[in-house]
UniProtKB/Swiss-Prot annotation:
Signal peptide: none annotated. Belongs to the radical SAM superfamily. Biotin synthase family. Its cofactor is [4Fe-4S] cluster; [2Fe-2S] cluster. Binds 1 [4Fe-4S] cluster. The cluster is coordinated with 3 cysteines and an exchangeable S-adenosyl-L-methionine. Binds 1 [2Fe-2S] cluster. The cluster is coordinated with 3 cysteines and 1 arginine. One of its GO terms (biological process) is biotin biosynthetic process. It is an enzyme of class 2 (transferase). Homodimer. This is Biotin synthase. It holds the Pfam family Radical_SAM. GO terms for molecular function: 2 iron, 2 sulfur cluster binding; 4 iron, 4 sulfur cluster binding; biotin synthase activity; iron ion binding. NCBIfam families: bioB (TIGR00433). It comes from the Bacteria. Keywords: 2Fe-2S, 4Fe-4S, Biotin biosynthesis, Iron, Iron-sulfur, Metal-binding, S-adenosyl-L-methionine, Transferase.
Length: 335
């Protein structure tokens, strides 16, 4: 069985990424089968509980108040609304709810208290709950843990070297500090990046090296594909080739074998065949929706019926929620 390492070198990762494609997919699929059931995919639902009006300048984001996009600032959703959305998602087979707020950081106010209540209620439904709320202090992480939060998402986005080209209002160290604050609790870490920002292969390798040398690895590694939003600085970026996406997923799977690798934002433009290659390369999670949207109008997302049809075609089942004590995947060899 392939062991888990935390000392990956840049040259090693680049060599893996540049392996002939079919051989790379084979190697990644072999690793995947040692740690995960290759016949199961976790289906997740992302709820934008606070949309738009973010003060940060992330070049890709429609929710930044600095850019003229179709997204307008909205108030925090009512708890009952969020819980009802989660309940409907659960009825379709969704096992993980991710709640996102367009905040720079979490503030200790009534809105945070409301989020804590949302976490409690959705956790009580037997679902995994993930939050992505911006920067987080150690004390706030503990409060989320006490509310029953399963995971906290804080992406690195890209390599440390390329990062300042994409965002200037939050440092790379800020992101790593938030991850460390989450690590002080029993909440699992969700952290990945975005393809298509204008980064080089070296930047992709650098981001993966940072993630793969965190000890422990993030339990969840989302691989996002840029959706070019009109009005943002990256609106004219070219599409990422499918084989770049597959290479990134396969490399992440080999470097972090026990982690969930999530085929996240940008999946709507991929065909069923292209998504099948991503699953073969080690992706074992997707985001689905009942309204063709992931974050309001910012990122299109396939609907439940479309995804169910695809999973049935590929012979893949929906994975149930994990239990707290199982937050790090155990090795499981499936025939």
């Amino acid at each position: 069985m392939v062991g888990i390492r935390y000392d990956w070198q840049e040259l090693e990762i680049r060599a893996i990424y540049n392996t002939p494609l079919l051989e790379l997919i084979y190697q990644a699929a072999s690793v995947h089968r040692q740690y995960h059931d290759p016949t199961k995919i976790q289906v997740c639902k992302l709820i934008s509980i606070k949309t738009g009006g973010c003060p940060e300048d992330c070049s890709y984001c429609a929710q930044s108040s600095r850019y003229k996009t179709e997204v307008k600032a909205e108030a925090l959703l009512e708890k009952e609304t969020v819980v009802n959305i989660a309940q409907k998602a659960k009825e379709t087979g969704v096992s993980r709810i991710c709640m996102g707020a367009a905040w720079r950081e979490v503030r200790d106010n009534s809105q945070f208290e409301e989020v804590l209540e949302m976490v409690k209620d959705i956790t009580a439904m037997g679902l995994e709950v993930c939050c992505t709320l911006g920067m987080l202090t150690a004390n706030q992480a503990r409060k989320l843990e006490e509310a029953g939060l399963y995971a906290y998402n804080h992406n690195l986005d890209t390599s440390q070297e390329y990062y300042s080209t994409i965002i200037t209002t939050r440092t790379y160290s800020d992101r790593l500090n938030t991850i460390e604050n989450v690590r002080q609790t029993n909440v699992t870490v969700c952290s990945g990046g975005i393809l298509g920002l204008g980064e080089t292969v070296d930047d992709r390798v650098g981001m993966l090296q940072t993630l793969a040398n965190l000890h422990p690895h993030p339990e969840s590694v989302p691989i996002n594909i840029l959706s070019q939003v009109p009005g943002t600085p990256l609106e004219n970026q070219p599409d990422v080739p499918i084989w770049d996406i597959v290479r990134m997923i396969a490399t992440a799977r080999i470097l972090m074998p026990a982690s969930d690798v999530r085929l996240s934002a940008g999946r709507a433009r991929l065909s069923q065949v292209e998504q099948a290659f991503c699953f073969m390369a080690g992706a074992n999670s997707i985001f689905s929706s009942d309204d063709n949207k992931m974050l309001t109008v910012t990122t299109p997302c396939p609907d439940y019926d479309t995804d169910r049809e695809m999973l049935n075609l590929l012979g893949l089942g929906m994975r149930p929620p994990s239990q707290r004590q199982e937050k790090v995947a155990s090795p499981a060899v499936v025939g």
